[in-house]
Amino acid sequence: MKNAVGIDIPAEIKGIGKLKPFDGSRYSGWINNAPFISERHKESVKIVKDLITAVERSGLRNGMTISFHHHFRNGDFIINMVLEVLARMGFRDLVLAASSLAEIHAPVIGHIKSGLIRRIETSGMRGELATAISNGLMDLPVLFRSHGDRGRAIAEGDLKIDVAFLGVPSSDPYGNANGYSRDGDNSSACGSMGYAKVDAQHAKQVVLITDHLVSFPNTPFGIPQSQVDLIVKVDRIGDPKGIISGATRFTKNPRELLIAKMAARVIKASGYMEDGFSFQTGSGGAALAVTRYLREYMLEENIKANFALGGITGQIVAMHEEGLIKKILDVQSFDLQAVESLKNNRFHQQIDAAYYASSGIEGAAVNQLDVVVLSALEIDTGF
């Protein structure tokens, strides 16, 4: 079958199932907006003593699909922690549906070899795991989706999650959770819970893993208690310092800075950079560096942006606080300044991945953008 740009897409992949090529339409006609709510007895308690108990109560079985978010990026402790427990419990043939996998997740290689993980669906992969996969580690191909299309696939049921294991920096005993806390301890704050929000809404079972339990109600919350089944308290869920790594680093590389400066000049000359415009700068040293040059042009021309979208950095926050950007829509906080801003700034709003960029809805935030700057390892010139 051919997709909207004429590229042949297999109709079916053995072990994965039937595929539907993108036909150019932003609206597929079916979105399951209702969260999955399991039946609950009045006497049941959400907090359990450990991960083993949570797994047992979740109903997880061999062959099911488990999901995770990557808001801690290379500082994430949850995926390795949960997979180690599942390996000790003897599970096999699971589908790993993480929103992304980083260098810290190299232990997944061993879990693939042992048979714990049969297949992977994700939006990104780095480090030793990516190299091993590229060299033929798995029998079945990895299914990569964009962050927005992962949100669409979950909402529409193309990606059915049996149990979501979601690390949250704060939660109350009922499961109102967020990426920061207003009750003091922010040692594991990660900011926006944009990727986790979709999993929480649609997974059959949601297990929150936190290192900071607070009193009810934990407001504001990114994940409401109505979407949470079980809660486990652990010593640490992640290291926020790992958020700034790899693609989200601040560059001093002269070549990347030159690329950024040239990109900003193109934007200025495009005619789109006018008062009230909107923009997104993605991950990658050069892409993130564009922001500083846009700021200079905006000050020169007395231009203010209506909103900035996407992975949010301290540079975007500074421009917001300076009055150059009116509002921020945040699906992922790229540094600790962005984390702090989400907690303190009224017009810094966290959004979920489907709201951000789903191809299955007409009103996705990306459709409102005037300017987007993204990075790539390779770009063709003769597609």
Where are these regions (language model features)?
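Conserved alpha/beta enzyme-core scaffold
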Residues: M1-G382
